[in-house]
């Protein structure tokens, strides 16, 4: 029995954010690929290529710190997730926000650091 693409998309749409993140990680591991956009490959295409300054950043939670409750509240404030999703993301670590400006990334980093968490801006 073979699933159609529509059935696969519908099944993914029913999953929570954490389940989808776990699915992406499993696909990356199984097939040896990365879900990250290949931005650097275009810039390194030739010597005449102009190096562009990064305009979009990703904020990644690397460590929630000692006070998880404060970190969960901060994650909820930053992401707009519900309590359970924010708790799961805080405990597992991972991407808080993608495609944000440098100013917003720094604001998120400051807010999370004040909550005792460690974040990385990529």
Curated annotation (Swiss-Prot):
One of its GO terms (cellular component) is cytosolic large ribosomal subunit. The keyword Transmembrane helix does not apply. One of its GO terms (molecular function) is structural constituent of ribosome. The keyword Repeat does not apply. Keywords: Ribonucleoprotein, Ribosomal protein. Gene3D superfamilies: 3.30.1390.10, Single helix bin. InterPro entries: Ribosomal_bL12, Ribosomal_bL12_C, Ribosomal_bL12_C/ClpS-like, Ribosomal_bL12_oligo, Ribosomal_bL12_oligo_N_sf. Transmembrane segments: none annotated. Forms part of the ribosomal stalk which helps the ribosome interact with GTP-bound translation factors. Is thus essential for accurate translation. Homodimer. Part of the ribosomal stalk of the 50S ribosomal subunit. Forms a multimeric L10(L12)X complex, where L10 forms an elongated spine to which 2 to 4 L12 dimers bind in a sequential fashion. Binds GTP-bound translation factors. This is Large ribosomal subunit protein bL12. It comes from Xanthomonas oryzae pv. oryzae (strain KACC10331 / KXO85).
